[in-house]
Amino acid sequence: EPLFRTVGNDATFYRPPTASQLSRYLNQIPEDFEMCAKVWEEITIPTYATHARYGIKAGQRNPNFLNADAFIKLVLQPYRDARFGPHTGPFLFEFQRHGLSVQEFCSGLDGFFARLPKDFRYAVEIRNAGMLGPQYHEVLRRHDVAHVYNHWTFMPSLAEQHQRMRTFTAPFSVFRLQTPLRMTHEAAKTRAEPYNRIVGELPEMRQDTVRLVRQAASENRTTYVLVNNRAEGNAPLTIQALVESLRE
């Protein structure tokens, strides 16, 4: 049985794919393969950072933040045009740390997901642990949107995230194993390069992932586990270890 049944597409965070790009993917992927694409950041950042890539928009408020019409037209439509549906995994909305209150953020999510088509699946990844809680959980549950369990620098462990969430919120679950906890992106990158071996196992990450995947499976939830080389040094070897643990 193949280990690689899905992939996370990070490039779509910077620009949504065109229908022609998606059509080219169709010619390269197996029949039962699904792609989990990050949503264009134009939809997920309330204010543009003071970064050169934003040009004259740097530091300004983003009028397309949680704009359902923009998402449907600019992000979803190419998938429809390319007839990519059977290969479309959950769309991943990555929200960087921001200045919104829990109430503001959850209210925005609620109105946004209420307007989205129900024939696609959506998942939210937050980078601010303070957002985890009943209000966030309820909004996701109401719209069958998954929380992305992200093993990332400033987030709590996967087990603690689930403890705060209490239950899964959608008929599917998503895990992104990205960096060791409390380690910056650059430090994790330096540690992991050249990505050809396990440079340091993360036992808690592995154990939490296996336990939560088993729980999701016992509840008949489809599960997507996306692993970055920066987590342990070599994503395929991490995936192989997780699969072996799941088979025990």
Predicted features along the sequence, with ranges:
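Residues lining hydrophobic/aromatic ligand-binding pockets adjacent to catalytic sites
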Residues: 1-248
